Amino acid sequence: MKEATKYIHAGAEPDPSTGAIMTPIYQTSTYVQEAPGKNKGYEYARSQNPTRTALEKAFAEIENAKYGLAFSSGVAATDAVIKLLAPGDEVVCGNDMYGGTYRLFTKVFEKFGIKFIYVDTTNISSISKAITGKTKLVWLETPTNPLMNITDIAAVAAITKPENILLAVDNTFASPYLQNPIDLGADIVMHSVTKYLGGHSDVIQGSLMMNSLELRDKLYFIQKSCGAVPGPMDCFLVLRGIKTLHVRMKAHCENGAKIAHWLRKHPKIGKVFWPGFEDHPGYTIAKKQMRDFGGMLSFVLKNDSVEEAMRVLSSTKLFSLAESLGGVESLINHPASMTHASIPKEERIKNGLTDSLIRLSVGIEDADDLIDDLATAIG
């Protein structure tokens, strides 16, 4: 089945009682049972909800997985994965990850005896060297947020599989339209569904996809026991958003490429971080494991001035200064003070995330209008 067809029909079945083509919003907290223990597959909405069931089926289908689980946020989905571990276990992860993930790892889970080892995951040997007998999980972002670094998922899977180490990939920046980590050997795929899957900046949600039934059952137990589940209205909004994923992502990619190339030629721009440049260190891998290069990019001004960066951030009109990404509207962001503020400055600087870095989530407006907006702001 072609991608466009898959996204439109994923998780979709006409409502058996009415024939409604769209999954109904089952806005209920509980379900009537015929007798104790005798129900119609649903007993309490924290455990199951028909709208969520349809969405979880869609999640699996769009990532070429067997199972999907929906969570109340991307961080909640990440939280569930780490709860598979025990005190003394170790996790190898990237040194330029999303700030919210870093905060969860360092401020929440380290005190429970789980050790997180941060390495440059673009260097596969760095991952190999960091693995010990206590390593239970490798956590990847690719492309990374916000420096757009690329990690070879298949190469990492070749290391983790023989050692029975779980490989989880945060696929938020790519979306299933561009990359399917399970096809490349990942055990778990995580999405901040808030971003491209929702696509309209109107829902907070996360997801996990996997092929292993044993892994699915463990994660479902955590999902239902800890209760970080989305409501049916949120599930409905994401079901609707997924139907246009292919149309939106094509436009994101086209606009992203135009803006990346325009920025690179601008005399006031120092460096542009975007994996579609042929001289990007991860270009060859990105071309192999991704279908296109996406609508996310970052840049620094040539003078590397924090003051000038702040002026640009406050001067755009079409690019809204805001957290998040992946919506139809374009956003501009200052990672050092916004999405990655929880990472200590010395760690950020060491890993290349400077105070002057600007991140763009390129929307699906007319590319020329977006370029005009940036041109005016940059000056």
Where are these regions (language model features)?
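Positively charged, small/polar-rich N-terminal and surface patches that mediate targeting and assembly
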Residues: 2-4, 10, 228, 271, ...
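Conserved PLP-enzyme active-site core in the AAT-like
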Residues: 9, 67-268, 273
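Glycine-rich phosphate/pyrophosphate-binding loop
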Residues: 25-26, 34-54, 58-61, 331-356
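Short hydrophobic/aromatic beta-strand micro-patches
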Residues: 209, 298-300, 361-363
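PLP-dependent enzyme catalytic core of the Aspartate aminotransferase-like
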Residues: 115-117, 133-136, 248, 303, ...
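N-terminal glycine-rich, Lys/His-bearing helix-loop that initiates the first secondary-structure elements
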Residues: 1-42
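Conserved small-domain helix->loop->beta segment predominantly found in fold-type I
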Residues: 257-317, 321-326, 343-349
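Conserved N-terminal alpha-helix of the aminotransferase class I/II PLP-enzyme fold
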Residues: 30-79, 83-84, 100-107
